[in-house]
Protein backbone atom coordinates (compact mmCIF):
# COMPACT_ATOMS: atom_id res chain seq x y z
CA UNK A 1 0.00 0.00 0.00
CA UNK A 2 1.33 3.46 -0.89
CA UNK A 3 2.40 5.81 1.89
CA UNK A 4 -0.21 8.39 0.94
CA UNK A 5 -2.98 5.78 1.09
CA UNK A 6 -1.81 4.55 4.49
CA UNK A 7 -1.68 8.08 5.91
CA UNK A 8 -5.08 9.03 4.53
CA UNK A 9 -6.61 5.87 5.98
CA UNK A 10 -5.15 6.68 9.39
CA UNK A 11 -6.68 10.14 9.27
CA UNK A 12 -10.04 8.62 8.34
CA UNK A 13 -10.12 5.69 10.77
CA UNK A 14 -6.88 5.61 12.75
CA UNK A 15 -8.64 5.20 16.09
CA UNK A 16 -9.50 1.66 14.94
CA UNK A 17 -5.77 0.83 14.86
CA UNK A 18 -4.14 -0.20 18.13
CA UNK A 19 -1.41 2.14 19.41
CA UNK A 20 1.19 -0.66 19.40
CA UNK A 21 0.51 -1.25 15.71
CA UNK A 22 0.86 2.47 15.01
CA UNK A 23 4.27 2.45 16.71
CA UNK A 24 5.32 -0.45 14.47
CA UNK A 25 3.95 1.30 11.40
CA UNK A 26 5.75 4.52 12.33
CA UNK A 27 9.06 2.64 12.33
CA UNK A 28 8.24 1.14 8.92
CA UNK A 29 7.40 4.57 7.48
CA UNK A 30 10.27 6.41 9.15
CA UNK A 31 7.88 8.77 10.95
CA UNK A 32 8.12 9.52 14.70
CA UNK A 33 5.72 7.31 16.65
CA UNK A 34 4.30 10.32 18.49
CA UNK A 35 3.46 11.94 15.15
CA UNK A 36 1.66 8.90 13.77
CA UNK A 37 -0.38 8.62 16.96
CA UNK A 38 -1.45 12.25 16.50
CA UNK A 39 -2.35 11.64 12.84
CA UNK A 40 -4.44 8.63 13.83
CA UNK A 41 -6.29 10.55 16.53
CA UNK A 42 -4.72 8.77 19.51
CA UNK A 43 -3.32 10.50 22.60
CA UNK A 44 0.46 10.58 22.79
CA UNK A 45 1.93 8.88 25.88
CA UNK A 46 3.78 11.37 28.05
CA UNK A 47 6.99 9.34 27.75
CA UNK A 48 7.12 10.13 24.01
CA UNK A 49 6.85 13.88 24.62
CA UNK A 50 9.77 16.23 25.36
CA UNK A 51 10.60 17.16 28.95
CA UNK A 52 9.48 20.53 30.30
CA UNK A 53 11.84 23.19 28.92
CA UNK A 54 12.26 26.95 29.02
CA UNK A 55 10.26 28.57 26.20
CA UNK A 56 12.78 31.38 25.63
CA UNK A 57 15.56 28.83 25.29
CA UNK A 58 13.42 26.83 22.85
CA UNK A 59 12.86 29.96 20.76
CA UNK A 60 16.58 30.79 20.68
CA UNK A 61 17.46 27.18 19.88
CA UNK A 62 15.09 27.07 16.90
CA UNK A 63 16.23 30.49 15.67
CA UNK A 64 19.93 29.67 15.81
CA UNK A 65 19.58 26.23 14.23
CA UNK A 66 17.59 27.77 11.36
CA UNK A 67 20.73 29.66 10.27
CA UNK A 68 22.59 26.41 9.49
CA UNK A 69 22.93 25.16 5.92
CA UNK A 70 22.53 21.51 4.94
CA UNK A 71 26.06 20.36 5.76
CA UNK A 72 25.89 22.18 9.09
CA UNK A 73 22.47 20.69 9.87
CA UNK A 74 23.77 17.17 9.23
CA UNK A 75 26.68 17.77 11.62
CA UNK A 76 24.36 19.37 14.16
CA UNK A 77 21.96 16.43 14.04
CA UNK A 78 24.88 14.09 14.76
CA UNK A 79 25.91 16.38 17.64
CA UNK A 80 22.38 16.26 19.11
CA UNK A 81 22.22 12.47 18.85
CA UNK A 82 25.59 12.20 20.61
CA UNK A 83 24.37 14.01 23.72
CA UNK A 84 23.52 11.84 26.74
CA UNK A 85 19.87 11.23 27.52
CA UNK A 86 19.06 12.75 30.90
CA UNK A 87 16.21 11.30 32.95
CA UNK A 88 13.66 13.95 33.91
CA UNK A 89 13.52 14.60 37.69
CA UNK A 90 9.80 13.81 37.88
CA UNK A 91 7.19 11.87 35.93
CA UNK A 92 6.43 13.14 32.40
CA UNK A 93 3.69 15.76 32.34
CA UNK A 94 1.44 16.38 29.37
CA UNK A 95 1.43 20.15 28.67
CA UNK A 96 -1.80 22.12 28.73
CA UNK A 97 -3.34 23.40 25.47
CA UNK A 98 -1.07 26.36 24.62
CA UNK A 99 -3.42 28.47 22.47
CA UNK A 100 -6.25 30.90 23.28
CA UNK A 101 -8.86 28.82 21.41
CA UNK A 102 -9.24 25.05 21.07
CA UNK A 103 -8.81 23.46 17.66
CA UNK A 104 -12.13 23.30 15.82
CA UNK A 105 -11.07 21.11 12.90
CA UNK A 106 -9.31 17.75 12.79
CA UNK A 107 -6.30 18.97 10.84
CA UNK A 108 -5.85 22.01 13.09
CA UNK A 109 -5.63 19.63 16.04
CA UNK A 110 -3.21 17.42 14.09
CA UNK A 111 -0.94 20.36 13.28
CA UNK A 112 -0.92 21.52 16.88
CA UNK A 113 -0.07 18.00 17.99
CA UNK A 114 2.83 17.72 15.55
CA UNK A 115 4.23 21.06 16.73
CA UNK A 116 3.77 20.08 20.37
CA UNK A 117 5.50 16.73 19.85
CA UNK A 118 8.70 18.74 19.33
CA UNK A 119 8.17 20.87 22.41
CA UNK A 120 7.22 23.95 20.41
CA UNK A 121 4.26 26.27 20.26
CA UNK A 122 3.71 28.74 17.43
CA UNK A 123 5.83 31.29 19.31
CA UNK A 124 8.94 29.09 19.37
CA UNK A 125 8.98 28.19 15.68
CA UNK A 126 11.58 29.86 13.44
CA UNK A 127 10.54 32.23 10.65
CA UNK A 128 8.32 30.29 8.21
CA UNK A 129 7.28 33.01 5.79
CA UNK A 130 3.80 33.15 7.37
CA UNK A 131 2.33 35.73 9.74
CA UNK A 132 1.61 34.86 13.37
CA UNK A 133 -2.09 35.46 12.79
CA UNK A 134 -2.03 32.94 9.93
CA UNK A 135 -0.23 30.37 12.07
CA UNK A 136 -2.65 30.83 14.96
CA UNK A 137 -5.52 30.41 12.53
CA UNK A 138 -3.97 27.16 11.29
CA UNK A 139 -4.03 25.61 14.79
CA UNK A 140 -7.57 26.90 15.36
CA UNK A 141 -9.61 25.90 12.30
CA UNK A 142 -7.38 25.05 9.36
CA UNK A 143 -9.87 24.33 6.61
CA UNK A 144 -9.23 23.92 2.86
CA UNK A 145 -8.52 27.30 1.28
CA UNK A 146 -6.66 28.78 -1.68
CA UNK A 147 -3.46 29.23 0.36
CA UNK A 148 -3.44 25.85 2.06
CA UNK A 149 -0.84 24.21 -0.17
CA UNK A 150 1.48 27.18 0.36
CA UNK A 151 0.94 26.89 4.12
CA UNK A 152 1.73 23.16 4.02
CA UNK A 153 4.95 23.92 2.16
CA UNK A 154 5.87 26.34 4.95
CA UNK A 155 5.28 24.08 7.96
CA UNK A 156 6.34 20.65 6.64
CA UNK A 157 10.09 21.32 6.81
CA UNK A 158 10.40 22.46 10.45
CA UNK A 159 8.28 19.46 11.43
CA UNK A 160 10.68 17.14 9.62
CA UNK A 161 7.88 15.88 7.37
CA UNK A 162 8.28 15.18 3.67
CA UNK A 163 5.90 17.28 1.59
CA UNK A 164 4.01 14.32 0.03
CA UNK A 165 3.36 12.83 3.48
CA UNK A 166 1.98 16.02 5.04
CA UNK A 167 -0.09 16.72 1.92
CA UNK A 168 -1.60 13.24 2.26
CA UNK A 169 -2.50 13.86 5.91
CA UNK A 170 -4.12 17.16 4.90
CA UNK A 171 -5.90 15.41 1.99
CA UNK A 172 -4.41 17.87 -0.48
CA UNK A 173 -3.16 16.93 -3.94
CA UNK A 174 0.62 16.88 -4.26
CA UNK A 175 2.67 17.39 -7.41
CA UNK A 176 6.40 16.86 -7.88
CA UNK A 177 7.13 20.49 -8.75
CA UNK A 178 6.13 21.69 -5.27
CA UNK A 179 9.04 22.74 -3.05
CA UNK A 180 9.44 23.67 0.63
CA UNK A 181 8.89 27.38 1.16
CA UNK A 182 11.66 28.48 3.57
CA UNK A 183 12.99 25.43 5.41
CA UNK A 184 13.15 21.81 4.27
CA UNK A 185 12.84 18.68 6.38
CA UNK A 186 16.56 18.64 7.17
CA UNK A 187 15.94 21.45 9.68
CA UNK A 188 13.06 19.46 11.13
CA UNK A 189 15.30 16.43 11.53
CA UNK A 190 17.38 18.40 14.04
CA UNK A 191 14.25 19.56 15.89
CA UNK A 192 12.97 15.97 16.03
CA UNK A 193 16.32 14.62 17.22
CA UNK A 194 16.29 17.28 19.96
CA UNK A 195 12.97 16.14 21.46
CA UNK A 196 14.60 14.39 24.47
CA UNK A 197 17.02 17.25 25.25
CA UNK A 198 16.92 19.28 28.44
CA UNK A 199 17.01 23.07 28.59
CA UNK A 200 20.75 22.98 29.32
CA UNK A 201 21.36 20.70 26.34
CA UNK A 202 19.33 22.99 24.07
CA UNK A 203 21.55 25.90 25.15
CA UNK A 204 24.61 23.78 24.34
CA UNK A 205 23.17 22.84 20.94
CA UNK A 206 22.31 26.46 20.13
CA UNK A 207 25.93 27.44 20.83
CA UNK A 208 27.11 24.62 18.57
CA UNK A 209 24.75 25.86 15.84
CA UNK A 210 26.24 29.36 16.11
CA UNK A 211 29.75 27.95 15.97
CA UNK A 212 28.99 26.06 12.78
CA UNK A 213 26.91 28.72 11.01
CA UNK A 214 29.17 31.63 12.09
CA UNK A 215 25.97 33.59 12.71
CA UNK A 216 26.72 37.15 13.82
CA UNK A 217 24.74 38.97 16.50
CA UNK A 218 23.25 42.33 15.48
CA UNK A 219 22.31 43.74 18.87
CA UNK A 220 18.60 44.13 19.59
CA UNK A 221 17.67 43.54 15.95
CA UNK A 222 18.23 39.97 14.84
CA UNK A 223 17.56 39.15 11.17
CA UNK A 224 15.54 36.01 10.56
CA UNK A 225 16.97 33.12 8.61
CA UNK A 226 15.75 32.97 5.03
CA UNK A 227 16.33 29.22 5.06
CA UNK A 228 18.13 26.89 2.71
CA UNK A 229 15.17 25.13 1.09
CA UNK A 230 16.39 26.18 -2.34
CA UNK A 231 19.56 24.15 -1.79
CA UNK A 232 17.83 21.00 -0.53
CA UNK A 233 19.47 17.94 -2.14
CA UNK A 234 16.09 16.19 -2.25
CA UNK A 235 14.91 18.69 -4.88
CA UNK A 236 17.56 18.80 -7.63
Regions found by a protein language model. Give the residues of each.
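A short, Lys/Arg-rich alpha-helix, primarily the initiator
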Residues: 1-14, 86-121
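Recognition helix of helix-turn-helix/homeodomain-like DNA-binding domains
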Residues: 1-17, 24-26, 39-43, 129-147, ...
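The DNA-contacting recognition helix of HTH DNA-binding domains
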Residues: 3-4, 33, 122, 132-133, ...
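Short, charged amphipathic recognition helices of the HTH superfamily
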Residues: 17-22, 117-124, 148-149
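DNA major-groove recognition helix of helix-turn-helix/homeodomain DNA-binding modules
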Residues: 20-35, 149-165
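The alpha-helix within a helix-turn-helix
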Residues: 26, 115, 125-126, 156
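Central "turn" residue of the DNA-binding helix-turn-helix
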Residues: 30, 119, 129-130, 160
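Interfacial/linker helices and their anchor residues that mediate assembly or domain coupling
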Residues: 44-102, 174-236
Amino acid sequence: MERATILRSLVASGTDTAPWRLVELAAELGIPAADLLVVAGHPVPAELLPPERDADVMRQFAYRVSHCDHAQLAALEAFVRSLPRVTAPGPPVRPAWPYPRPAETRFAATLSGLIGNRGFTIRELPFLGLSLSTLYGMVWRWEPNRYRRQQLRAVAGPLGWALPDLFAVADESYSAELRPMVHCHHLGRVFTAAVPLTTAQLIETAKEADRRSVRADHGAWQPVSQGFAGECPDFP
